Amino acid sequence: MLTFDAHLDLSLNALEFNRDLRLPAHELRRREAGMTGKGIGRGTTAFPEMRRGEVGLCVATQLAGCMAGPRPIANWMSSEQAWAQTQGQLSWYHAMEEAGHMRQIKDLRGLDEMIALWTNGQPNDNKPIGYVLSLEGADSIRSVGHLERAWEQGLRAMGPAHYGVCRYALGHDMVGGLPANGKELVQEMDRLGMILDVTHLSDGCFWDALEIFQGTVWASHSNCRALVPDPRQFSDEQIKALISRGAVLGSALDAWMMIPGWIRGKTMPQDVHLKLEVIVDHMDHICQLAGNAMHVGIGTDLDGGYGTEQTPEDLDTIADLARIPDMLAKRGYSTQDIENIMHGNFFRLLRQALK
């Protein structure tokens, strides 16, 4: 079944981890054998596995922050440096387009063309992967007026924060609302028609942003606080607010977001027997709050700076997303519900935003 993944850090992996994503994931692991570092030799995501799992369309990020305090990856001392990093990431996406492996989706016509390509019944082996460009954390936007330049480059979604104190917002691990420039940024996103990604926002920033922003909203990779008590997840009150706005939440496969008590860098999937099917618990929780299956989708974050040491033990690569439809069917979800979760709900929001 065609799958839309609402959050992949593809360019981060290509440039920060030096991974040629045209190669199979297992070949990338082989090449990293003997190297050290989080996620090294354990990557799950590459183009061949995306094609095999029918992950034909995705949201692909740019990521370069100026977050206060040291961060292990993609964090810079100035917005100018961060902007330059995002431009390098954009250049990589363009190089993959020129090589026939990706195709950027900027408008409704582009979206419909990619959906048609991936549902034409032909083999997927050589199909380009369609991507909607998103920015995870707005620190690289040098000024509010600078956002339009990113829009012209095809940026269609953005989350104002990542971790900690960011230039325009506070991350989920902080307490407080949007500063004045953050409110201006959200207003400019609204004017341009950009999608607001509320993932990673502090609770205060979340509520401020929803009050200001009138356009299309999603949470690209967020799970349920009722199941995993942590500010990184959304409370039922927040989920209900997103449902009332017609939003969709992408379910993430980062292990510490799936079950309570996970200690990053210490707990291993085999220690707690974490299975892929646990993500259906989060999906079902959102569906129960909504009374339907119209507000949840897939947003794996599978390549977000970690690997199989921080994913379900029965997940080898992103191709395993193809097992989720059967898991949903066993829970009583209809074929239409499953199609909506795997791709239809996010497609609906994209059609709304890209019209």
Give the positions of each predicted feature.
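Loop-centered beta-sheet repeat module
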Residues: 175-211, 216-221
